[in-house]
UniProtKB/Swiss-Prot annotation:
Superkingdom in the source lineage: Bacteria
Keywords per UniProt: Amino-acid biosynthesis, ATP-binding, Cytoplasm, Histidine biosynthesis, Hydrolase, Nucleotide-binding
Protein family membership: Belongs to the PRA-PH family.
Gene Ontology biological-process annotations: L-histidine biosynthetic process
Predominant location category: cytoplasm
EC number: 3.6.1.31
GO molecular function: ATP binding; phosphoribosyl-ATP diphosphatase activity
EC class name: hydrolase
Protein name: Phosphoribosyl-ATP pyrophosphatase
Localization in the cell: Cytoplasm
């Protein structure tokens, strides 16, 4: 999975410099962070609704599709802020051996 995130991160970085008329990602970057955040919020809502539907009807296709959209737009946001996907992977790896309760408690100390 890390390979696809690395590849996608590279493509997203390249698209920051592309013509906004030729690339969806470039057009998001050109419109700025607020537009990107709007898309992240929209995809988050769609993911939540798909999950609720999946619980009712047992179909996971839309949850997978909407989660992919959410991850994609989150990666665009990170790219816009010059944060590489590897930085998120490192943070997840750091948390892997920490219980959720310990991690949550440590946030209050920062």
């Amino acid at each position: 999975m890390n390979d696809i995130l690395t590849q996608l991160g590279k493509v997203l970085e390249e698209r920051k410099l592309a013509d906004p008329d030729s690339s969806y990602v470039a057009s998001l970057h050109a419109k700025g962070l607020n537009k990107i955040l709007e898309k992240v919020g929209e995809e988050c809502t769609e993911t939540i609704l798909a999950a609720k539907d999946a619980e009712q009807d047992g179909s996971t296709h839309n949850v997978i599709y909407e989660t992919a959209d959410l991850w994609f737009h989150s990666l665009v946001m990170l790219s816009h802020l010059n944060i590489a996907p590897q930085e998120i992977m490192q943070e997840l790896a750091r948390r892997f051996d920490i219980s959720g309760l310990e991690e949550k408690a440590s946030r209050g100390k920062k």
